[in-house]
Amino acid sequence: MLPQDPVILLSVLNTKLRDKYSSLMELCDDLDEDEASLLVLMDRAGYVYDREKNQFKPSNS
Protein backbone atom coordinates (compact mmCIF):
# COMPACT_ATOMS: atom_id res chain seq x y z
CA MET A 1 0.00 0.00 0.00
CA LEU A 2 1.30 3.43 -0.94
CA PRO A 3 1.30 6.40 1.45
CA GLN A 4 -1.60 8.85 1.21
CA ASP A 5 0.39 12.00 2.00
CA PRO A 6 1.28 13.52 -1.41
CA VAL A 7 4.80 14.64 -0.41
CA ILE A 8 5.70 11.25 1.04
CA LEU A 9 4.02 9.54 -1.92
CA LEU A 10 6.14 11.62 -4.32
CA SER A 11 9.31 10.50 -2.57
CA VAL A 12 8.27 6.84 -2.50
CA LEU A 13 7.20 6.81 -6.15
CA ASN A 14 10.33 8.51 -7.45
CA THR A 15 12.57 6.25 -5.37
CA LYS A 16 10.81 3.12 -6.63
CA LEU A 17 10.85 4.39 -10.22
CA ARG A 18 14.57 5.13 -9.97
CA ASP A 19 15.61 1.93 -8.20
CA LYS A 20 13.24 -0.80 -9.35
CA TYR A 21 10.80 0.04 -12.14
CA SER A 22 11.41 1.12 -15.72
CA SER A 23 7.97 2.74 -16.01
CA LEU A 24 4.98 3.89 -14.00
CA MET A 25 2.91 1.19 -15.68
CA GLU A 26 5.32 -1.49 -14.42
CA LEU A 27 5.21 -0.05 -10.90
CA CYS A 28 1.40 0.06 -10.90
CA ASP A 29 1.12 -3.49 -12.25
CA ASP A 30 3.49 -4.84 -9.61
CA LEU A 31 1.89 -2.94 -6.71
CA ASP A 32 -1.68 -3.49 -7.96
CA GLU A 33 -2.34 0.26 -8.17
CA ASP A 34 -4.51 2.05 -10.73
CA GLU A 35 -2.23 4.17 -12.91
CA ALA A 36 -4.93 6.68 -13.90
CA SER A 37 -5.97 7.27 -10.28
CA LEU A 38 -2.36 7.72 -9.24
CA LEU A 39 -1.78 10.24 -12.03
CA VAL A 40 -4.87 12.22 -10.96
CA LEU A 41 -3.82 12.16 -7.31
CA MET A 42 -0.34 13.41 -8.15
CA ASP A 43 -1.71 16.04 -10.54
CA ARG A 44 -3.92 17.40 -7.76
CA ALA A 45 -0.81 17.61 -5.59
CA GLY A 46 0.97 19.57 -8.34
CA TYR A 47 3.09 16.84 -9.94
CA VAL A 48 3.14 15.25 -13.38
CA TYR A 49 4.82 12.08 -14.59
CA ASP A 50 7.70 12.57 -17.03
CA ARG A 51 7.85 9.35 -19.07
CA GLU A 52 11.26 10.16 -20.56
CA LYS A 53 12.88 10.63 -17.16
CA ASN A 54 10.64 8.07 -15.43
CA GLN A 55 9.87 10.38 -12.51
CA PHE A 56 7.29 12.76 -11.14
CA LYS A 57 8.14 16.44 -11.36
CA PRO A 58 6.39 19.67 -10.34
CA SER A 59 3.74 20.48 -12.93
CA ASN A 60 5.06 24.02 -13.38
CA SER A 61 8.49 22.94 -14.65
Over which residues does each language-model region extend?
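N-terminal acidic leader/helix
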Residues: M1-L24
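Generic serine detector
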Residues: S11, S22-S23, S37, S59-S61
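Short alpha-helical "recognition helix" segments of helix-turn-helix
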Residues: L27-C28
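Short, charge-rich amphipathic interface segments used for partner binding and complex assembly
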Residues: D32-N60
